[in-house]
């Protein structure tokens, strides 16, 4: 089940109990659809169009994992992650970015993110990173 929510249309989302919930903060609809096609069926997906909405949806739905685009309107991924970290130091946040230099990855990791995924998205690597995060969370529970 996937839900794409426009800012003016925030509605309750039914969360499936047996699936990890992933919040995808992505302002580009094509990129979101790519994530959805890779992850649908395996995860409960919720969608934020910008960083501010991602913070609001995090507080409302408490997802287990966040995929956070870096370059978004209203509030970028760095600021959104900083805000989310005020509420939870534990939720894994993976930065999704077109910036692919080593210095970009270093900045991401120093900014409170738990992982880094350069665009274009590689489905196999994304699934592997999510599986690793989920296994760590299950061990910690």
Predicted regions and their residues:
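Active-site beta3 strand of CheY-like receiver
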Residues: 61-67
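Conserved acidic carboxylate
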Residues: 26
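Disordered, acidic interdomain junction associated with two-component signaling
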Residues: 1-23, 138-141
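Charged docking surfaces used in two-component/phosphorelay signaling
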Residues: 33-40
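C-terminal output helix
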Residues: 3, 121-130
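Receiver (REC) domain active-site loop signature in two-component systems and cognate sites
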Residues: 72
């Amino acid at each position: 089940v996937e839900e794409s929510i426009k800012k003016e249309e925030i509605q309750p989302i039914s969360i499936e109990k047996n699936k990890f919930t992933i919040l995808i903060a992505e302002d580009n609809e094509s990129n979101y659809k790519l994530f959805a096609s890779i992850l649908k069926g395996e995860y409960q997906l919720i969608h934020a169009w910008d960083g501010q909405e991602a913070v609001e949806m995090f507080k409302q739905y408490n997802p287990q994992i966040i995929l956070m685009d870096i370059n978004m309107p209203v509030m970028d991924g760095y600021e959104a992650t900083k805000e989310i970290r005020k509420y939870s130091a534990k939720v894994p946040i993976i930065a999704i970015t077109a910036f692919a230099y080593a210095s970009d990855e270093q900045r991401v990791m120093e900014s409170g993110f738990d992982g880094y995924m350069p665009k274009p998205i590689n489905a196999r690597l994304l699934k592997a990173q999510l599986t690793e995060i989920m296994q760590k969370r299950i061990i910690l529970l």
